[in-house]
């Protein structure tokens, strides 16, 4: 089977990593309870920033956010390694900017994710991502972003939301922990 995965906030805990960096850079101590209550993908409001200030902060820290100590979600690496071992095809489909594609791929490999050159795609806007997902005929796709998930509802693909504070309003199947994927596959077969 073909499995597709978004990367940020689906396989790796990027927003929480960025949240800690913001606290450090701004010399603040905004609690994780605030982070977990955010209803938007963007985290700047928790620090009293405008959209413009938040965008500037995010872009100024991009390399540090993407390539330092950001952790994969528990069991994400092991789960994808197991899928690969079972003979499934794993696709990574991310909206990360083109200039970060190759370094992101290298970073994922260093973390232990099974990455194949011909199944790693980056630099796509949401609309492109959606068309591409349909074009390659994935059996399963996992993402955190409401705009992507909502557009795939009703398409011939099993779509799952990686549970986050900002996608709770979606009424679609979800995955909270990567340990659940084996059971999901068994149920669907």
UniProtKB/Swiss-Prot annotation:
One biological process term in Gene Ontology: deoxyribonucleotide catabolic process
E.C. numbers: 3.1.3.-
GO molecular function list: 5'-nucleotidase activity
Top EC group: hydrolase
Alphabetized UniProt keyword annotations: Hydrolase
Cystine bridges: none
Pfam families: NT5C
Family: Belongs to the 5'(3')-deoxyribonucleotidase family.
PANTHER family: NUCLEOTIDASE YQFW-RELATED
Protein name: Putative nucleotidase BC_3386
């Amino acid at each position: 089977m073909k499995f597709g995965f978004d990367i940020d906030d689906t396989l790796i805990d990027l927003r929480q990593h960025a949240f800690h960096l913001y606290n450090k850079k701004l010399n603040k101590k905004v609690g994780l309870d605030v982070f977990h209550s955010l209803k938007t993908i963007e985290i700047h409001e928790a620090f009293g920033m405008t959209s413009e200030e938040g965008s500037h902060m995010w872009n100024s820290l991009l390399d540090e956010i993407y390539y330092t100590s950001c952790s994969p979600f528990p069991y994400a690496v092991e789960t994808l390694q197991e899928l690969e071992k079972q003979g499934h095809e794993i696709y990574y489909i991310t909206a990360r900017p083109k200039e970060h594609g190759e370094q992101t791929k290298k970073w994922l490999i260093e973390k232990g994710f099974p990455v194949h050159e011909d199944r790693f795609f980056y630099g796509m806007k949401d609309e492109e991502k959606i068309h591409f997902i349909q074009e390659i005929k994935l059996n399963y796709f996992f993402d955190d972003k409401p705009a992507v998930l909502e557009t795939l509802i009703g398409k011939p693909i099993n779509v799952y939301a990686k549970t986050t504070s900002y996608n709770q309003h979606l009424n679609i199947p979800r995955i909270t922990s990567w340990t659940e994927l084996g059971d999901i596959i068994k149920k669907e077969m």
